[in-house]
Amino acid sequence: MTVRPEIKAVFFDLDGTLLPMDQSVFAKEYFKGIAGHIAPYGIAPQQMIDFTLAGTAAMVHNDGSQTNEQVFWKTFFKELGEEKEGISEIAAEFYYNGFKALKAQTGENPLACEAVKTAHCNGRKV
């Protein structure tokens, strides 16, 4: 007899699962937004894009000894060649404010709300 482990949580990938979008259009607008937000602080838009991609790649290979945030910023500043004071906070400001504009690049999935509610009603963490 096979014993099935109890499912305690359900993880959804927003990018295309619960939140329909054209990934390439979304990414283009995302990078335009964050690069424009950071540019006045001395990081050229293309540098911001390149360093963000490098940091993201480093997170994919994270061995778990550091948080993804730590790995990202360590890689970002290594690529930049210096550690700029306050850049992580300025980037966070974009996520609190400017990121909302990217909603226009996404669609709605009428089943998304139902899927999340069903998971919650069945005692699962989401």
Residue ranges and their predicted role:
Residues 19-20, 57-59, 99-102:
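A short, structure-level motif marking secondary-structure boundaries and short turns
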Residues 90-96, 101-107, 112-126:
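Substrate-recognition element of Asp-dependent hydrolases with the DxDx(T/V) motif
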Residues 42, 81, 120-123:
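Glycine-centered loop/turn motif at secondary-structure junctions
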Residues 29, 33, 71-75, 114:
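Alpha-helical elements of Rossmann-like donor-binding domains used by nucleotide-donor carbohydrate transfer enzymes
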Residues 54-96:
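A metal-dependent, Asp-based hydrolase signature
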Residues 2-12, 17-51:
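Active-site neighborhood of HAD-like aspartate-dependent phosphohydrolases
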Residues 22-25, 64, 103:
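Short, solvent-exposed loop/turn segments at secondary-structure boundaries
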Residues 1-10, 113-121:
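Asp-based, Mg2+/Mn2+-dependent phosphohydrolase catalytic module
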